[in-house]
Amino acid sequence: MDKMKIIGGDRLRGTIKVSGAKNSAVALIPAAILADSPVTIEGLPDISDVHILGSLIEEIGGSFSFDGKEAVIDPTNMVSMPLPNGKVKKLRASYYLMGAMLGRFKRAVVGLPGGCHLGPRPIDQHIKGFEALGATVTNEQGAIYLRAEELRGARIFLDVVSVGATINIMLAAVRAKGRTIIENAAKEPEIIDVATLLSNMGAKIKGAGTDVIRIDGVEKLSGCRHAIIPDRIEAGTYMIAAAATNGEVVVDNVIPQHVESLTAKLREMGVRVETGEDQILVCGTDVLKAVDVKTLVYPGFPTDLQQPFTALLTKANGTSVVTDTIYSARFKHVDELRRMNANVKVEGRSAIVTGPVKLQGAKVKASDLRAGAALVIAGLMAEGVTEITGVEHIDRGYSNLVEKLSDIGATIWREKMTDEEIEQVKNA
């Protein structure tokens, strides 16, 4: 196991390149199961979630080759067999295998997923969708069993706007008989990305990116080439890092429209943000204004940037309120920021941040992926050395983070942990 060390106080300057979208990648790979010939995906991020999904594909008879940039998935010889709990448990998005395997084989057995622990977020909307399409769903010994004689199109209204459920129902419906209509669908860019791949494979999908998606089932889908969209959350994280260090950073390979909510908030704080076609320039400033932020479904402020943004707000003049309407329990980073001298308190679904304070380097632990990003940003701002454990969470969603930040002037590196340190972290 590794730990990450950061010596804070450097101004970030230069160009940083964004990788492919994690939240697309974890759905595009399972989507390839639905094809009858190989699918090539360009620009996949080199993150642990992608590697775990690749090995799951291999366990059910597919082949997966990935050179760190491009993946080729050959689903031809796949069989419907139970997916083991071990790897599935490591990966929240392993639930997309349910929709894809149901769509192709009319049956699937998938262990209940793991990933980030963000409080209550059950997969009941996914199950509701599968049942509407004609599947029976049972929960047996910690695994979900899906079975269907045949899948038939249906009209499905989602009770809550859910990216996961929207994509999973799309995957199950593209080869069903007849028309499926998903109402109150999520509108995230990653949904459009998955729909684009499926359409390139031969699916008939209209309305992805709006709240009503119509899918006309087809008999077969074929392999194709697809280029993944850039990761808007990674882009946003680096935009926040630039503002936090009073830096001057060009974020390259980004779709500016995908980060408009963050751009607006940074400008409100006094940060200069200039957008180009696929680049964004962020220039920090010494004095930042406090702002209030409320996370919402896309195109609102993303819950995935709430934690990194909270770290930035410790530097702003005045009191800021950050409210997470999506995941109420997503404040595990606050205790760690407090260790670094932040003045933050949690009240219900909100974090109240009073600034400006000078953060101090400390030993902190990342409890989940975006908490890890928040602690990296805090470390870049802090005086002295910050040591972060729980780095495996960061590796789930940020490709080559240490190298990318080092290239633009951060003093950041990884070290192997001693057995003694690993024990301490486990018992903490």
Swiss-Prot record:
Phosphoenolpyruvate binds at K22, N23. GO terms for cellular component: cytoplasm. It is an enzyme of class 2 (transferase). The active site is at C116. It is found in: Cytoplasm. InterPro entries: Enolpyruvate_Tfrase_dom, Enolpyruvate_Tfrase_sf, MurA_subfamily, RNA3'P_cycl/enolpyr_Trfase_a/b, UDP_GlcNAc_COvinyl_MurA. One of its GO terms (molecular function) is UDP-N-acetylglucosamine 1-carboxyvinyltransferase activity. UDP-N-acetyl-alpha-D-glucosamine binds at R92, R121, P122, I123, D124, Q125, D304, I326. Its EC number is 2.5.1.7. It catalyses: phosphoenolpyruvate + UDP-N-acetyl-alpha-D-glucosamine = UDP-N-acetyl-3-O-(1-carboxyvinyl)-alpha-D-glucosamine + phosphate. Pfam families: EPSP_synthase. The keyword Iron does not apply. Pathway: Cell wall biogenesis; peptidoglycan biosynthesis. GO terms for biological process: cell division; cell wall organization; peptidoglycan biosynthetic process; regulation of cell shape; UDP-N-acetylgalactosamine biosynthetic process. The modification 2-(S-cysteinyl)pyruvic acid O-phosphothioketal is found at C116. Keywords: Cell cycle, Cell division, Cell shape, Cell wall biogenesis/degradation, Cytoplasm, Peptidoglycan synthesis, Pyruvate, Transferase. Cell wall formation. Adds enolpyruvyl to UDP-N-acetylglucosamine. Belongs to the EPSP synthase family. MurA subfamily. This is UDP-N-acetylglucosamine 1-carboxyvinyltransferase 2. It comes from Geobacillus kaustophilus (strain HTA426). The gene is murA2.
